[in-house]
Amino acid sequence: MASQQKVVEIYTDGACSGNPGVGGWGAILRWNGHERELYGGNAHTTNNQMELMAAICALKALKEPCLVDLYTDSVYVRNGISKWIEGWKKNNWRTASKSPVKNMELWQTLEDACSCHAVRWHWVKGHAGHPENERADALARKAIAQYRENGRFPT
């Protein structure tokens, strides 16, 4: 009998104090009545980089191939991975206007993190009262606060 893939909901957010500046990311993973919170950050980063890192770290935390519904308030992340990335690759990591793609390494890492999962990307409006998006945002801000307090991010 074939085993059924685990269905996981992931909620992500990134935050940056200054852009660039100190940034944090947060993610909530939910499956079969269980939840796990993840967060981290970088001392010199951008909001878009933290949005990407939230999705990357959440997907990498999965221990087996899963069916994933990933919710982000970043149109940049959702469109980048679901609409733009194939064109970027065909154009040798250049945009339609021939500029180098920003955050290329993170996009490549995100694509790799998605490769063993079936990921459905969903956009949610940020700062609009969506409970899990608000929690992911709070985790991202917690990472920034911890860095400011003791000079390091959670591990």
Swiss-Prot record:
Catalytic activity: Endonucleolytic cleavage to 5'-phosphomonoester
Sites where the protein binds Mg(2+) 2: D13, D137
Group of enzyme by EC: hydrolase
Transmembrane as UniProt keyword: no
Binding residues for Mg(2+) 1: D13, E51, D73
SUPFAM superfamilies in alphabetical order: Ribonuclease H-like
Family classification: Belongs to the RNase H family.
Name recorded for this polypeptide: Ribonuclease H
